[in-house]
Swiss-Prot record:
One of its GO terms (molecular function) is metal ion binding. Disulfide bonds: none annotated. The keyword Disulfide bond does not apply. It is found in: Secreted. Its cofactor is Ca(2+); heme b. Belongs to the peroxidase family. Classical plant (class III) peroxidase subfamily. This is Peroxidase 3. Binds 2 calcium ions per subunit. Binds 1 heme b (iron(II)-protoporphyrin IX) group per subunit. It comes from the Eukaryota. Its EC number is 1.11.1.7. Ca(2+) binds at D6, T9, D14. GO terms for cellular component: extracellular region.
């Protein structure tokens, strides 16, 4: 879930995931 999503959207996902 995190791997494929991070690859497609490392910016928006990363921001939301980290926060």
């Amino acid at each position: 879930n995190l791997a494929p999503l991070d690859l497609q959207t490392p910016t928006a996902f990363d921001n939301n995931y980290y926060k």
